[in-house]
Regions:
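Nucleic-acid endonuclease domains
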Residues: 1-109, 116, 121, 127-255
Length: 255
């Protein structure tokens, strides 16, 4: 990783934002202002290489005006895995123009993207209300991650990107939200076999960043294969459970 997350934590601890005027103190409403603090601090470290995901794509296409259509624009990203993780899809890419640029989307893979020397540091920001015991947040689709691992293996892409998570822990004090602590973790340093897949929540991997162990010491090739083994095992178990619960009790009525 290129970003000095320890410096980012030092800078944002103690920062405050006004309590939202409406809505619950969770999710996007409370988290967005802290996300901007993190973005600002990372941009201080890499002023010319830090982007929002949509900003990076807009900048890339703006700099290559002769590339028209989805195929030509997708070819600007020389990594199938990175293209899969960052692309907005063929229709959106084909319809892009200077007058019709991309806007921020909540389901973008990266909240923040640091790109330097063809290395992509994908950063996702999570916020947590420390006053409440809440379910771990959605991190990334288990299926999307499986597809990414397959592309990594197919194309031998194990050293051109990483995926990091940054958690802001905050607490409500009077009329302000105060950042009490922050944590960071690298997805590819976690044990892939321990990642929890919530099949009922759109197949999302869920964890609190502060709880994600960082004990995996093998390379990304082994990580990708280990994760795919874990995903396939869990998917087969889920399929068996679905058949046992929702198919077998009713088969006798239709035979």
């Amino acid at each position: 990783m290129k970003v000095n997350y320890t410096e980012v934590i030092r800078a944002i601890k103690g920062t405050t934002i006004p309590k939202p005027l409406s809505g619950t103190l969770s999710g996007h409403a409370a988290g967005e202002p802290f996300d901007k603090y993190v973005y600002k601090e990372i941009k201080k470290q890499f002023p010319n290489n830090t982007f929002r995901q949509y900003e990076y794509l807009n900048d890339l296409y703006n700099k290559n005006p002769t590339c028209i259509g989805a195929k030509a624009r997708e070819a600007l990203v020389n990594s199938p895995t990175i293209l899969f993780l960052l692309s907005r899809g063929k229709n959106a890419t084909g319809n892009w123009s200077i007058d019709n640029p991309f806007d921020e989307k909540q389901n973008d893979t990266a909240d923040i993207l640091v790109v330097e020397n063809n290395f992509y540091e994908i950063i996702d920001i999570k916020t947590r209300n420390t006053s409440k015991s809440a379910q771990a947040p959605n991190i990334i689709s288990a299926y999307k991650l499986a597809q990414s691992c397959a592309k990594m293996i197919d194309n031998g892409e194990f050293d051109n990107f990483t995926i990091n998570y940054f958690e802001v822990d905050w607490k409500l004090e009077e009329d302000k939200l105060v950042c009490k602590d922050a944590h960071f973790a690298c997805l590819f340093k976690s044990n892939p076999e321990s990642l929890y897949i919530n099949w009922a929540a759109a197949m999302q991997i869920q964890f609190h960043v502060c709880d994600l162990e960082q004990t995996f010491v093998e390379n990304m090739d082994i990580w990708a294969k280990s994760y795919l083994k874990h995903f396939v095992t869990q998917a087969k178990k889920r399929a068996d459970d679905m058949i046992t619960k929702f198919v077998k009790p009713f088969e006798k009525y239709i035979t």
